[in-house]
Every structure is written in structure tokens, then in C-alpha cells.
């Protein structure tokens, strides 16, 4: 039996990174082999691609270029880090995966979800998460959180106007409906302690 692949999705400021940092020690304490990682990134090549994608000055980046860079980073991360961990029966907690591309590039950028999905099917060879937690939050609330977080670097996507971030959320909600068999929507506009408790319960009920 292979490991379990859990992805955490959500718009900017939804609390994904903070949530994963809390989930990691919880499952480690339960003697679970667990690994946390992120997209784009997780390994050297993909972190370099992340730097390119997030550079504020690269406002000229075209939507298809953006989609292909995310897919390239995803492929390398998958084969170099995620798949080996799953083969070793780890619980892998990943900050973003394919659903981000569907919401951001497929819907918000207007490339079409089906086209972006096919690009990523090629990149992932149909390796899909066992479970996805989607942290839902109003764009205004998420962006306000980012502004208050002095330790978080503002990236190119953060700088998009509010209409873009609203489209991202609309895209995510369509993705949730399309893949309702593996995606669970959780309200992210609640205290982090309650959010952690809810997500832990979902993971344990569905997978462990």
C-alpha cells in the first residue's frame, strides 16, 4: 500500500501554510510518517521556478507561460520528492497542487480548465491527491490578512487587482464541484485552532 497524498488549497491569505505547519507535528506525534512540502517549490529546480513565477517585476508574463511553468515545477517536484515519499508510505501534506492551476490559470486567467487540466495530466501522469482540503475565504479577508503579515513577502500574484482574486475563488468553487469526490470545502474564516481541529478530523475520518 502506498502513502497518502493530501493537498491543501485556497486563495491568497486562506491560511494554508500556517495550517500545514500545525498538521505536521500533530501527525508526527501519532507516529505517522509525514512530510510537508509546497508548490511551486519543494525541491531546488521547482524553487527556482517559484522565484521566477513570484517576481513582482515579471508583470509581462503571459498566461500560458505561467501555466506551463507551474506544470514544469509540479512535474519535477512530483518525481523527485512526492512520489518517492508515497512509495515509502508517507502521509504527504502539500501546500497547493493541480487545483491551483485550474483556479488561477484555467479560470482566473481564462485559459480554460479543460486545457489546463490536460497540461497537468501530462505533467503528473494522473497522479492525483487522495484528499484535498479547500480553505474557502472571501478575497477581501484573505488579502487583508496578507497586509497584516509583516513576515510574508508580497509576490506577483498578490499584486493582482481584486477582480482577479474574486475570479480565483469562483474558479476554486467550480473545481470543488467538479471533483467533489476528493475535495472537502472548509470555511477558513474562523480561528486557526478551530480550523486545525476540523481539518484533522476530516483527514482522520477519510484516510486514517
Curated annotation (Swiss-Prot):
This is Thymidylate kinase. One of its GO terms (biological process) is dTDP biosynthetic process. Its EC number is 2.7.4.9. It catalyses: dTMP + ATP = dTDP + ADP. It comes from the Bacteria. Gene3D superfamilies: P-loop containing nucleotide triphosphate hydrolases. Belongs to the thymidylate kinase family. Pfam families: Thymidylate_kin. Keywords: ATP-binding, Kinase, Nucleotide biosynthesis, Nucleotide-binding, Transferase. InterPro entries: P-loop_NTPase, Thymidylate_kin-like_dom, Thymidylate_kin_CS, Thymidylate_kinase. One of its GO terms (cellular component) is cytosol. Phosphorylation of dTMP to form dTDP in both de novo and salvage pathways of dTTP synthesis. One of its GO terms (molecular function) is dTMP kinase activity. ATP binds at residues 10-17. SUPFAM superfamilies: P-loop containing nucleoside triphosphate hydrolases. It is an enzyme of class 2 (transferase).
Amino acid at each position: 500500500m502506498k502513502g497518502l497524498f493530501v493537498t491543501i488549497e485556497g486563495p491568497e491569505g486562506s491560511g494554508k501554510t500556517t495550517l500545514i505547519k500545525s498538521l505536521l507535528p500533530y501527525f508526527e506525534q501519532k507516529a505517522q510518517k509525514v512530510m510537508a512540502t509546497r508548490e511551486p517549490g519543494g525541491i531546488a529546480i521547482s524553487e527556482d521556478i517559484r522565484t521566477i513565477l513570484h517576481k513582482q517585476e515579471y508583470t509581462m508574463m503571459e498566461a500560458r507561460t505561467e501555466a506551463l511553468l507551474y506544470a514544469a515545477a509540479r512535474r519535477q517536484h512530483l518525481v523527485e520528492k512526492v512520489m518517492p515519499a508515497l512509495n515509502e508510505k508517507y502521509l504527504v501534506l502539500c501546500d497547493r497542487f493541480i487545483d491551483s492551476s485550474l483556479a488561477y490559470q484555467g479560470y482566473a486567467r481564462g485559459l480554460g480548465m479543460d486545457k489546463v487540466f490536460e497540461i497537468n495530466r501530462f505533467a503528473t501522469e494522473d497522479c492525483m491527491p487522495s484528499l484535498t482540503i479547500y480553505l474557502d475565504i472571501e478575497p477581501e479577508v484573505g488579502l487583508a490578512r496578507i497586509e497584516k503579515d509583516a513576515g510574508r513577502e508580497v509576490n506577483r500574484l498578490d499584486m493582482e487587482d481584486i477582480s482577479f482574486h474574486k475570479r480565483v475563488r469562483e474558479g476554486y468553487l467550480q473545481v470543488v464541484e467538479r471533483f467533489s469526490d476528493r475535495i472537502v470545502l472548509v470555511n477558513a474564516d474562523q480561528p486557526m485552532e478551530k480550523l486545525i481541529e476540523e481539518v484533522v478530523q476530516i483527514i482522520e475520518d477519510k484516510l486514517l
